[in-house]
Every structure is written in structure tokens, then in C-alpha cells.
Amino acid sequence: MNSGGLEREFFIYIPDNLIDSTDISPLVMNFHGGDGYAEYEMEYTGFRELSESENFIAVYPQGTVAEGKGSTGWFTGIGCNTAGEVCDVAFISELIDALVSEYYIDADRVYASGFSNGGFMIYSLACYLSDKVAAFGPVAGLMYTEELDNCTPDRPLPIIHIHGENDSAIPIEGSSYAV
């Protein structure tokens, strides 16, 4: 799909029992970490198998390549980060709208989880898409201090935060740029 002038990719998994169904189903979006790929995340998380037993549609959006870095990730932070023309929050908002209109998805049961850089993206979605995402599950990802100071969700948010105490890459206590 095109978002902000960029061709964006995602993988979708519809359980066998929902392919021909007209039942309204939840949507679970899962975000890969930095240097990651949606296809790997789809294989790694086990959400495909879980969706078969729990009757939800799983979607794995693909981040973009950061200019100068050469690796994939999510541009998180205040709305649309200053990283060129990429606006991942807008992409996810448009993706949710497209999926809800094309598939039998309950717009009130859209959930988001993500690992590491994907967890940072989850906090951005909590700040800016609280009207579209029902609950949030960041794993080993934090919120930028600047974002915390400017985060004004539309409602109280259900969030489950999972983080290891021995994480040296993204310490749970945060750093000078993240809390």
C-alpha cells in the first residue's frame, strides 16, 4: 500500500476458520525490532498458530530503511519523526483503516504488540492512535522522554509492558533519551 508517497509492505495471516467467515474478528498487529523484518516476526512470534485457536487476524507491518543507517526499523517519536518523509504513525493509521474496510475486523478490537524498536513504536501508537488501538503490548521497548512529555491519548490505556531486568541494549530504567 502507498503511504506518504512510499510503498509500504505488511504480511497478513487469516486463520483457516476465518477465511470464508463473515464473523467479525479482532486484529493483532505485531511490530518487528530494529534491523528486523515482518516476515521473520511472523515466523518467530507464534501469533499465526495462536490466531488459529483464538480466532484473530494477525498483521505484521514492515518498517522502512533508515537513511544513512541501512537497516530497517520504525521512526518513532513525536507523531512523525524528523527522519525525512517517513511517518510510521500515519502508515499504521491508514493500514488499520484499510484492513477494517477490507476484512471482517472489529474496529474496537485492534491490538498492537512489538519488540525492541517495535516496542518503541507501540508507545508512539498509544500516544497518537489511542482512538484506533484498544490495547498495547510493548516488549523490551520504551518511550522517548520527549514523547512522554507530549503524549495525550484520548483515554486511559491498557498496556502490558514486558521487559527483562538484564537488558543491556534498552535498560528497563531508561536512559537520557528514553523512560
Where in the sequence are the language-model features?
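Primarily recognizes the serine-hydrolase "nucleophile elbow" in alpha/beta-hydrolase
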Residues: 100-157, 168
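Conserved alpha/beta-hydrolase "acid-adjacent" motif
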Residues: 169-173, 179
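Conserved beta-strand->loop/alpha-helix structural units within folded catalytic cores of enzymes
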Residues: 31-33, 116, 162
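Protein kinase-like catalytic core scaffold
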Residues: 27, 158-160
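Short beta-strand/loop motif that positions the catalytic acidic residue
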Residues: 161-163, 167
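Residue-level signal for short, function-critical loop segments
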Residues: 16, 95, 116, 142, ...
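Serine-hydrolase catalytic machinery in alpha/beta-hydrolase-like enzymes
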Residues: 3-14, 18-111, 121-124, 128, ...
